From Swiss-Prot:
Enzyme class: transferase
Protein name: tRNA U34 carboxymethyltransferase
Alphabetic keyword roster: Transferase, tRNA processing
Enzyme Commission number(s): 2.5.1.-
NCBIfam families listed in its UniProt record: PRK15068.1, tRNA 5-methoxyuridine(34)/uridine 5-oxyacetic acid(34) synthase CmoB
Residues where carboxy-S-adenosyl-L-methionine binds: 89, 103, 108, 128, 150-152, 179-180, 194, 198, 313
Species of origin: Glaesserella parasuis serovar 5 (strain SH0165)
Catalysed transformations (reactions): carboxy-S-adenosyl-L-methionine + 5-hydroxyuridine(34) in tRNA = 5-carboxymethoxyuridine(34) in tRNA + S-adenosyl-L-homocysteine + H(+)
Classification via InterPro entries: CmoB, Mo5U34_MeTrfas-like, SAM-dependent_MTases_sf
GO BP annotations, alphabetical order: tRNA wobble uridine modification
Amino acid sequence: MIDFRPFYQQIATSPLSAWLETLPLQLKQWEKQTHGDYAKWAKMLDHLPSLPCEVNLADKVEARLVEPLSAGETQRLVHHLKQLMPWRKGPYHLYGVHIDCEWRSDFKWDRVLPHLSPLKDRLILDVGCGSGYHMWRMVGEGAKMVVGIDPTELFLCQFEAVRKLLNNDRRANLIPLGIEQMQPLQAFDTVFSMGVLYHRKSPLDHLAQLKNQLVKGGELVLETLVIDGDINDVLVPADRYAKMKNVYFIPSVPALINWLEKVGFKNVRCVDEAVTTSEEQRKTDWLENETLVDFLDPQDHSKTIEGYPAPKRAVIIATN
């Protein structure tokens, strides 16, 4: 099983120390309720090699071995990593193996990065972090510590697999909880929430929860689905959106800015809008599930298969 004690030691003398009042008990309870496959995934981590390597997090997530693996060793590594499929967010380049994930998350990072306050020496929270691709890119920008939260057990095991192949780097940590389970720490310099808001039944509550994790003057980076329209326009899908059952509210950019200001954020601005393309989200050898092309109207890719506007994402920056 995955040991969280090193993380407790890390935060004991940090601005996150108050989290130790609740977190250890929460994670003990979490371990009792884990998915049936979790033990199998966690045990697989023991089979991964940990070899001397050069780590590059500056422009990708890469671990280059001093001495390359043999063909047989590479085949075994691929076999172990594919036990953790589907790999959704990446890509990763590890020990000569290219994990070509469903999402080219580097595309999103390239859109977001130019607009951020410098991440160097910052304490960062990444909400809904998935397997942690963007967390490693934040570390590459010089963050002091990045904490990701995501309750999905597979993502935790994928993250720990990548960490092991990155020289067991402790500057990033994934905690398998949701934002609603976190006490208000008001301790993070930057909080990211990317690809989460539209899954929330109460989006304003989610924005308030993000605000409660930021220091005064801290920065929120919010990325979410949007539609065209004015301050009054919000899409509430009748049933599914792009075959997703758990999509509740997709606002226009002006409506989203209004929500953020309503919960108390300042200096709210939209810095990027991008339609999701099949270059950014597509099927690969590391994903057997359906992907973007399966979610769109086959006759008109400007619409989802249900007839709604096709996915478009906006990046919003705001100050606490």
